[in-house]
Amino acid sequence: MSIREWFEDRRKITGLLKNSVERDSKDVNEMERNKNLSIDYVKINRLWVQCDNCESLLYIRFLRENKSVCEECGYYLQMNSSDRIELLIDRGTRHPMDEDMYTLDVLQFHSENEPAHSDPLHSEDESYKDHITFCQIETGLTDAIQTGIGQLNGLPIALGVMDFKFMGGSMGSVVGEKITRLIERATEESLPVIMVCASGGARMQEGSFSSMQMAKIASALYIPQKDNRLLYVSILTSPTTGGVTASFGMLGDIIIAEPKAYIAFAGKIVIDQTLGQKVIEDFQVTEHLFGHGLFDLIVPRNLLKCVLSELFYVLQSSS
């Protein structure tokens, strides 16, 4: 090999290396750009929410100030239990109850030997225990309800608030026990009970243990209500369905519903298939049900605290 040929070979190798380095640099830069875009998307996702009805982008800070009601179309977005408590309870007056109570997988729903999945919410095979753990991490709650004692415009009350973000607000053993204890304490201390319902119904992973909570809560309410020792106000939000609707959701001395809330026992598709005929649209929406006498009041979210305090003052003065 001559010296000229050797230099030509070195030039070719150098050119190939240079092209390879340039391609690698472009790939790295592209990855960095995609990473930045991903970070920006996460930041944006924490600052903005899209309305489920009109698809408008809503700034979270303003949305919370507006009680999670869309500024564009007036649609009621879901509120978590902590925001509901902040809406109703005077600041600094709340004393939570049974925060350390958590669910046990008594039925061992799905074997622990089955393969795990990365996203429990999108896997029907995920164990119940893993699903509960996932929801606890996501929401910061031990189960689908928060209970406690507090003051509403200076009036002491007992409050239970269900959280739909925790397994669809489903009612299991812990939810039933916490509600029962809240009712018993309210009866002992002569406090009115407010229950904010947001649930898909009984929790299927607990089988009959879940269904039993319907009877247990109804029994806890029956005697105090019959003897006029307990005022129970049920607030139905969207969605309230299944076993919750069939039990304590509809047992209130006063039943209040939010505007345009979805309230039902069985879903529309199930009813269509069972009856073999089409049912009318929006027959499970607040306004239609109110027209047929299922509720006492429809109260906008921003007026709820004032309306409740007025009701309690009137009832206390008349008793």
From Swiss-Prot:
Cofactor(s) of this protein: Zn(2+)
Keywords, in A-Z order: ATP-binding, Chloroplast, Fatty acid biosynthesis, Fatty acid metabolism, Lipid biosynthesis, Lipid metabolism, Metal-binding, Nucleotide-binding, Plastid, Transferase, Zinc, Zinc-finger
EC number: 2.1.3.15
Superkingdom as given in the UniProt entry: Eukaryota
Pathway(s) the chain acts in: Lipid metabolism; malonyl-CoA biosynthesis; malonyl-CoA from acetyl-CoA: step 1/1
Matches recorded under Pfam families: Carboxyl_trans
Domain CoA carboxyltransferase N-terminal: 47-319
InterPro entries: AcCoA_carboxyl_beta (IPR034733), Acetyl_CoA_COase_Trfase_b_su (IPR000438), ClpP/crotonase-like_dom_sf (IPR029045), COA_CT_N (IPR011762)
Disulfide cross-links: none
A GO CC annotation given for this chain: acetyl-CoA carboxylase complex
Chain positions of all zinc fingers (C4-type): 51-73
Acyltransferase as UniProt keyword: no
Subcellular location: Plastid, Chloroplast stroma
Cofactor note: Binds 1 zinc ion per subunit.
Record GO terms (molecular function): acetyl-CoA carboxylase activity; ATP binding; carboxyl- or carbamoyltransferase activity; zinc ion binding
Positions of Zn(2+) binding: 51, 54, 70, 73
Class of the enzyme per the UniProt entry, highest EC level: transferase
Subunit structure: Acetyl-CoA carboxylase is a heterohexamer composed of biotin carboxyl carrier protein, biotin carboxylase and 2 subunits each of ACCase subunit alpha and ACCase plastid-coded subunit beta (accD).
Family named by the database record: Belongs to the AccD/PCCB family.
Classification via PANTHER family: ACETYL-COENZYME A CARBOXYLASE CARBOXYL TRANSFERASE SUBUNIT BETA, CHLOROPLASTIC
Protein's UniProt name: Acetyl-coenzyme A carboxylase carboxyl transferase subunit beta, chloroplastic
Protein species of origin: Picea abies
Lineage of the species this protein comes from: Eukaryota, Viridiplantae, Streptophyta, Embryophyta, Tracheophyta
Name of the gene encoding the protein in the UniProt record: accD
